[in-house]
Amino acid sequence: MRTLFIGDLHLSADRLDITQAFTHFLDTELDDADALYILGDLFEVWVGDDIAAPFALELANKLKQVSLKLPVYFIHGNRDFMLGKQFARAAGMQILPEVTCLNLYGVKTVILHGDSLCTLDKAYQRFRKLRSLALARWLYGCLSKKTRQGIADNIRSKSKSSNKHKSYTIMDVEPNAVNALLARTHAQYMIHGHTHRPAIHQLDNGCKRIVVGDWYQQGSVLSVSPQGIDLQSLPFSPQQD
């Protein structure tokens, strides 16, 4: 009896080794799981359900099989915020609000991707506010596939260049934002990703903030059970089929 949390896999056609590792995880690690939560950035980029790459469609079929055995939940990240109902249905995933509260074996828990907590990054927060507008998302969806892909590639390039010049503090969550969300939700645990800095933080207010890691060099999964929390690393195996 346990609930699993992952995020920041950044799956792409350029890194099929990560997709292979994730498929291996789905095949081998879920037998005793009550649910699987994917906390955003499942894909490196997602410009619309109508442009899903072949590897993504294969993954949808795999997740659909998993969803027949246990519920699979998804929260949008900053890379896959355009992932829609069409793909979610194909994958058997239920899309959750960007901030969701759970009762995890008697412990009130708030889960989210985590980018909303990086409030010191003013430029990114302005972009995040714009992209959250329904009108902006609708207009983007009306563009041609080629134009959407070009815009996404341009944003990724600028983001990568900009992040090289940002400090560690700006790129991390802001403590006041963390405390405010915990106070608003009355949660004891906060679980998020985004920062790629896996850790279990014991806060001064008695709460815990748990950060799931990325899947660039190895897998990262958080297991929560009635016995407690366990943040695990999953080495990529060359023997994965």
UniProtKB/Swiss-Prot annotation:
Primary location recorded for the protein, binned into one broad class: membrane
E.C. numbers: 3.6.1.54
Gene that produces this protein: lpxH
Gene3D superfamilies xrefs: 3.60.21.10
Official protein name in the record: UDP-2,3-diacylglucosamine hydrolase
Any one annotated GO CC term: cytoplasm
Binding site for Mn(2+) 1: 8, 10, 41, 196
Pathway: Glycolipid biosynthesis; lipid IV(A) biosynthesis; lipid IV(A) from (3R)-3-hydroxytetradecanoyl-[acyl-carrier-protein] and UDP-N-acetyl-alpha-D-glucosamine: step 4/6
Family annotation (Pfam families): Metallophos
Cofactor note: Binds 2 Mn(2+) ions per subunit in a binuclear metal center.
An example Gene Ontology molecular-function term: manganese ion binding
InterPro entries assigned: Calcineurin-like_PHP_ApaH (IPR004843), LpxH-like (IPR043461), Metallo-depent_PP-like (IPR029052), UDP-diacylglucosamine_Hdrlase (IPR010138)
Binding residue positions for Mn(2+) 2: 41, 78, 113, 194
CDD domains: MPP_YbbF-LpxH
Membrane topology: Peripheral membrane protein
Recorded catalytic activity of this chain's protein: UDP-2-N,3-O-bis[(3R)-3-hydroxytetradecanoyl]-alpha-D-glucosamine + H2O = 2-N,3-O-bis[(3R)-3-hydroxytetradecanoyl]-alpha-D-glucosaminyl 1-phosphate + UMP + 2 H(+)
Family recorded in the similarity comment: Belongs to the LpxH family.
SUPFAM superfamilies: Metallo-dependent phosphatases (SSF56300)
Domain of life of the organism encoding this protein: Bacteria
NCBIfam families: lipid_A_lpxH, PRK05340.1
